[in-house]
């Protein structure tokens, strides 16, 4: 029996990826690195920040930390007015009527997660941050932690993700997972293990 809905944050609850792309472009420009949408999808989306700067620039330590902080501060400046993915509030309302709980499982830093959730006027009963559990997506640990905190089996939850990395994380934890078509191709999400893809959360109502 379904008892919980688990959501990724960026690109899933709201289409924040264009803002992340802009912030990355600005902070990486002084390094002579141009980030186009395809590079963002392949090398940035769904990954932890330390992995990103190590991959793109070979940076680690204090310089990497300063770059990451600058990027995330710029993202929060840009993300002042966010709109939820269509159907999100309706899905959460229907889930509440059915007695389902819900949570957010994200690779985002805590400050970003709080900012986005506040902008969307959301207060999830559960928030799992990859940076606090020790491993990020695509590792299944964040979703395993979510299940453990809720006291649920994988088949008692549904996960919603927008990136192949996130899909692999949820599927690796055994959770039936659906891909949101906010940035990645449907074929890539299905190849990562998504049962199906959705253009918005109105389509997810039929899953309850």
Predicted regions and their residues:
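Asp-based, Mg2+/Mn2+-dependent phosphohydrolase catalytic module
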Residues: 1-3, 93-96, 100, 109-208
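N-terminal helical cap/lid subdomain that shapes the substrate entry/recognition surface
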Residues: 2-98, 109-114
């Amino acid at each position: 029996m379904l008892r919980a809905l688990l959501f990724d944050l960026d690109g899933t609850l709201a289409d924040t990826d264009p803002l992340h792309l802009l912030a990355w472009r600005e902070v990486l420009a002084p390094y002579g690195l141009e980030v186009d949408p395809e590079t963002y999808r392949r090398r940035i989306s769904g990954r932890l920040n330390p992995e990103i700067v190590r991959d793109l620039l070979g940076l680690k330590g204090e310089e990497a930390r300063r770059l990451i902080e600058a990027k995330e501060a710029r993202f929060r400046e840009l993300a002042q007015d966010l709109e939820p993915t269509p159907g999100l509030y309706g899905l959460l309302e229907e889930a509440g009527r059915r007695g389902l709980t819900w949570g957010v499982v994200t690779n985002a830093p805590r400050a970003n997660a709080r900012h986005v959730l506040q902008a969307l006027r959301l207060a999830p009963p559960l928030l799992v941050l990859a940076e606090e559990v020790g491993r990020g997506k695509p590792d299944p640990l964040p979703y395993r932690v979510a299940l453990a905190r809720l006291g649920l089996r994988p088949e008692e939850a549904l996960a919603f993700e927008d990136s192949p990395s996130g899909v692999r994380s949820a599927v690796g934890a055994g959770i039936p997972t659906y891909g949101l078509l906010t940035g990645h191709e449907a074929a890539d999400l299905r190849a990562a293990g998504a049962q199906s893809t959705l253009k918005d959360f109105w389509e997810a109502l039929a899953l309850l």
